[in-house]
């Protein structure tokens, strides 16, 4: 089949780029021709103002060189024209948080396709989309009904997490079990795509460093500056005493400003970003796809989970040291949903990592076996491959 992928592929964001790449490569590995529909949102352009200029160009270069793209689209009309020209046999939506916003004219619910007399017969399915919001009840009855009507026309639906499944079923289908399949993120399969890639180590030794991703200018102002600096000094001391370097893998928005032994400079290619995580002794820090990449690679990890409940109540619980109670409030977090029920459920804190024990986190990372991380990965991939086989069968009928 010739399959079009409609997802968030353009953002200057490592995870967005890699999930599109992994979906494309997986479909190709199953014998299909896969192209990423180059739909550009206003938000994609906005990233240019938010990230380092060199890093923005690195993401743009990756998308335009590594992804098999269609012509560019910015409207529903463009999408219809491109799909007709490409003569796709099927469209897949996702992965990533493409089902979170009512402000995109239901592009990612394929309303534009279902309304087209010429295209409405093309089968549509989803690959691990997520909602990552407060639900759909804030939308008007008409908006919710329009989304429901679209979903009823999908041939096969998977979502990335339990929160998205429960939210759709509750808010759009009156608690009916309409969505039943939770599908792991495509980036779990990324390790399969790097066998021919060469890591630009910049003088670092494989498994000779701990890797961290912290917020931009983490301790350069705001609250708890002294506590952040002390936490970092303590964690770095544990890492160095054990014989490792502490290396920063900066987020696209900017470097942390902390005194790492080494900071990977921009520009960072998304595949090189993955290889830095793969070759680390352990990873500690921000971002969902950094954690999925660590799992894909068998790298021990600890998540600085900024996606959870950041209410004042949760922050107070963390400041008081009541971390376990605070983490039970994170049901919307994609890290919470990723790790829930696994042996790694406790391998996360919220954004206030400075109130956690640096010694405890270091010990958790040192005691984690790569074999156990790989077992967790392989369980997720087994689910992913089962769902993908069912999805491909559904859209081929």
Question: What spans do the regions from the language model cover?
Answer:
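Active-site anion-handling motifs in enzyme catalytic cores
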Residues: 1-397
